[in-house]
Amino acid sequence: MLSNIIPLSIGAALGATARWLLNLAVPAAMSPATGNLFANWTGALLIGIFAETVNHPQWKLLLITGFLGSLTTLSGFSLETVTLLQSNRPASALSNIFLHTAGSLLLTWLGLKIGTAVK
């Protein structure tokens, strides 16, 4: 059990830190939602790559469940979308939904292709 908790915890700490740093790196002129979009897109690409290239169970826990689970954020995406709707900005909310969903699906597919190519 502990042999699973340690890599999971390390990955989660690194993923949460990466998301925080990514949000800090987003220029003030851009929407705060941009950091979460970049985090989700990065996570989508990486999960495709890792799904094809990482075989060891502890590495999967560290990279996929821990790191990517903390880097990506469905709850942040949900809050941003609901906030846009509550601010009477339905077009922005729909755009947010489309960018997160379509972009993540496309990047996961691309990541799987990259992972297969480097495997």
Curated annotation (Swiss-Prot):
The residues the record assigns to binding Na(+) are 69, 72
Question: Which InterPro entries does the entry link to?
Answer: FluC
Which Gene Ontology molecular function entries are recorded, alphabetically?
A: fluoride channel activity; metal ion binding
Activity regulation comment = Na(+) is not transported, but it plays an essential structural role and its presence is essential for fluoride channel function.
Q: Which residues form a coiled coil?
A: none
Listed under GO biological process in this entry are: cellular detoxification of fluoride
Keyword list (alphabetical) reads: Cell inner membrane, Cell membrane, Ion channel, Ion transport, Membrane, Metal-binding, Sodium, Transmembrane, Transmembrane helix, Transport
Quote the cellular component terms of the Gene Ontology held in the record.
Answer: plasma membrane
Q: What is its main location?
A: membrane
- Specify the protein's topology with respect to the membrane: Multi-pass membrane protein
Q: Which HAMAP family match?
A: FluC
Q: Show the PANTHER family listed in the entry.
A: FLUORIDE EXPORT PROTEIN 1-RELATED
- NCBIfam families xrefs: PRK14230.1
Functional description taken from the UniProt entry: Fluoride-specific ion channel. Important for reducing fluoride concentration in the cell, thus reducing its toxicity.
Which family, according to UniProt?
Belongs to the fluoride channel Fluc/FEX (TC 1.A.43) family.
Q: What name has this protein been given in UniProt?
A: Fluoride-specific ion channel FluC
Q: Which gene encodes it?
A: fluC
